Amino acid sequence: MGEKLDPELSSDGPHTKSSSKGQGTSTDNAPASKRRCVSTACIACRRRKSKCDGNLPSCAACSSVYHTTCVYDPNSDHRRKGVYKKDTDTLRTKNSTLLTLIQALLNYEEEDAFDLVRQIRSCDNLEDVAQSLVNQEKKSSGWLSNAVIHEENDIAQTDQFESELAGKMSNLVLDGSRKFIGGTSNLIFLPPGSELNEFKPGLATNGDLEGSVTRWTTVTDDQQLISHLLTMYFSWHYPFFTTLSKELFYRDYSRGVPSQYCSSLLVNTMLALGCHFSSWPGAREDPDNSATAGDHFFKEAKRLILDNDELVNSKLCTVQALALMSVREAGCGREGKGWVYSGMSFRMAFDLGLNLESSSLRDLSEEEIDARRITFWGCFLFDKCWSNYLGRQPQFTTANTSVSAVDILPNEESTLWSPYSDMGPSREYAQPSRTRAVADQISQLCKISGDLVVFFYDLAPKEKPSSKQLELKKLSEIHTRLEAWKKGLPKELEPREGQLPQALLMHMFYQLLLIHLYRPFLKYTKSTSPLPQHVSPRKLCTQAAAAISKLLRLYKRTYGFKQICNIAVYIAHTALTIHLLNLPEKNAQRDVIHGLRHLEEMGESWLCARRTLRILDISASKWQVQLPREAVIVFEQTHARWGSWGPWDQAASPSTTSDSPPSVSSQSVVATTDLSQPVSQSAGNQPANPSMGTSPNLTQPVASQYSSTPSGPVSVSAMRAVQRSFSAQLAHNEARQPEPTYLRPVSTSYGPVPSTQSAQEQWYSPTEAQFRAFTAAHSMPTTSAQSPLTTFDTPENLVEESQDWWSRDVNALQLGAEDWTQNWNNGLPTTSADWRYVDNVPNIPSTSAPDADYKPPQPPPNMARPNQYPTDPVANVNSNQTNMIFPGSFQR
């Protein structure tokens, strides 16, 4: 009994003995003490089944005997949970009772709630009241479950009805066309018998396929003309304004079967647009008046809208036709009517649900889904063009749009595109059309354009005006998006020589957005601008305008302006406002002259270009801009040729002032050999050439209207054009009367050019050897062989590349101007000095095709003679200062 125990032995026997011995020893040697009773033992003592004294932080057994870690965990003792179970159940019952009563009071009607309160106040036990409420709820739920089980056989119909009632959208066929019906509409309950027939009896027949093409219009039965105009439309207008499925259209067009992809309204609208790209007599209502191009087909389209009640039956082809009618009216300068047509198109697009993803709709084929998508994104482009053109908020926004991007169809993308003219197709610049790829890129630009216009050009009053920091943040965001778009552009769509016309227009649209982005910041000074010091909004606008001018010159060299969409007129106008701002800088002078000539050429096809010239003419006078001589000449020529645009034009036009009578006197003027009056008038009432701006009465107020600056030198190719033009026209005794526009312009007549001037004709017709000798003596620097658009990487390189040939070395192009004073009145000069007088040659149009790159200037006779200008035409130009007055449109 007295041997020492080993603590490593089993915990039962030895430990018990040791405890007994210890207790015995303690009883013998020390006074007796009662052990403290603890409710919870440590984990080690519970595992050993030994008694624990509950001492903290460690019990005696763990610290003295077993030397183990002592941990107390009351929650781990599951044997004591029954002690609290009764209390827990009681609390849970009370909480459930109170919760049941409170929910009943909240959900009961007013009278029932008062009854329940009285029952609670008079009851002996709240649990009984709560239990009665629970029983009532169980009875109600049991009745609902029995009702559901009873209707299991008709569950499919019930689900359909409930889904139509509770759904956010629905789709049905109404009036023979698919329409979007929203969740709040009751039209979903219309029975199937309410559908109407979409087509008239007898139209939807195959019949004779050979004559099916001529069934679409009553204007003409010339199948060749119809085919020619449609080809014009699909070659020049459709690639940019892609708003329909070409394959589906031609499928039904060739059959002569009206459908949602082809109708007489759509065909006549296409023909009206195709007329603007053709000079065939059948393309004009009046063959002798280019202002009537497409009017006869457009009148037929307007008749069809009323006669066929096209606005009642919403169809894809009607949406497309109305959108095309709107852009055609804009090209004719009738924005009011065009805006209404666009609104009808967009409303019908919403009616058809084109702004929603079509793949979720029922019973739609793949071709119909594709046609709906391409139609919507076409309307999206029309909307953004109208928004920019009129400065109004867009109708389609990203918030109300959930349509996927257009599908790139390999067959259509690989179809060969080639320039098409009145002479037929040309193999030059033939390449894959890439119509859908360009349309997708333009759609991305349109999204950016919409956000730009909404933020910077929304005139609606706001609760809190935009701060400079917010404007800077939004500007940075949109600029980043534009740069990302340009960076992600496929290589085959970059601007280059021979690029697709729609791709060039797309790049012009991109530069237009840059101008619109930075133009609102022109109102700030350098000290008040929120932009960083190194960022100049004027410089960025100038770079974008210069890029547009370069793209227009590239388009002219490649395709000419007879075939170009009218959106280019608006883009050119916007760029010219920036160039006017920068006058009299050399680059601005060049771009203004080129831009006005481009608009003059576009005016042959689009009336809006004629009006744009009048607007720029009046704006330049209002802003007191120093215009180059060539710009003044273009303004006077076009005004004499096309007349005034309206009362607003006549009130401000220099050609309708009191000093300028409407017609020239019929008295004959004797021709002289004095070169101060190189062209004279002759007797008779013969009509004059409208392009000759030589009438003193016509050009009398020019000096008072403009502050003309010396222009740059003229190229040898321009001199050659002048020589050809003048020599060809001297033999003509009669010239055409200026063609009147439908707006009844002010008529101006001129005397014919006398034909008995053999000496001057000889003077203007040097031999080819003399011409080569002259060009060798006055060699000019040539442009780089590099493509003019290969340096579009940075704006700095772009502006640097835009330094054109005539402004690089003005001393090499003075062409003997210093000798004009002494030879001015010495009679007819010899042929060796012919070209010194090239600037005084009137611009008499040649019967042959005009020079593709240059139209010679025609100075008015009352303008100062060349010896009144300094030798260097740009010597006094200060590039850092300008007399330009900011237009009101640039200021908020």
Swiss-Prot record:
Sorted UniProt keywords: Activator, DNA-binding, Metal-binding, Nitrate assimilation, Nucleus, Transcription, Transcription regulation, Zinc
Q: What is its main location?
A: nucleus
Name the residue ranges with Low complexity bias. Answer: 16-27, 649-674
Instruction: List localization entries.
Output: Nucleus
Q: Where is the composition biased (Polar residues)?
A: 675-714, 746-761, 876-892
Enumerate the residue ranges of region (Disordered): 1-32, 646-714, 731-761, 842-892
GO MF annotation: an example: zinc ion binding
GO BP annotations, alphabetical order: chromatin remodeling; DNA-templated transcription; nitrate assimilation; regulation of nitrogen utilization
Q: Record's InterPro entries?
A: Transcr_Regulatory_Elem, Transcription_factor_dom_fun, Zn2-C6_fun-type_DNA-bd_sf, Zn2Cys6_DnaBD
Q: Which residues bind DNA?
A: 42-70
GO CC annotations on file: nucleus
Looking up PANTHER family in the UniProt record yields: TY1 ENHANCER ACTIVATOR
Q: What does this protein do?
A: Pathway-specific regulatory gene of nitrate assimilation; it activates the transcription of the genes for nitrate and nitrite reductases (niaD and niiA).
Q: What is this protein called?
A: Nitrogen assimilation transcription factor nirA
Give the originating organism. Emericella nidulans (strain FGSC A4 / ATCC 38163 / CBS 112.46 / NRRL 194 / M139) (Aspergillus nidulans)
